[in-house]
């Protein structure tokens, strides 16, 4: 089970969310642009 989900820092770095998710996050974290 743990293999599928990123457990170590390296795994998290390698794993990158989809561009749409990144865009959504940027908009959410930077409301005033």
Curated annotation (Swiss-Prot):
GO molecular function, one term: neuropeptide hormone activity
Signal sequence region: none
Location of the region described as Disordered in the Swiss-Prot/TrEMBL record: 1-33
Disulfide bonds: none
Keyword flag Iron: no
Entry's Gene Ontology BP terms: neuropeptide signaling pathway; pheromone biosynthetic process
Keywords, alphabetical: Amidation, Hormone, Neuropeptide, Secreted
Matching PROSITE patterns: PYROKININ
UniProt main location, coarse: secreted
Intracellular or extracellular location(s): Secreted
Function: Involved in the control of pheromone production in females.
Protein name (record): Pheromone biosynthesis-activating neuropeptide
Taxonomic path: Eukaryota, Metazoa, Ecdysozoa, Arthropoda, Hexapoda
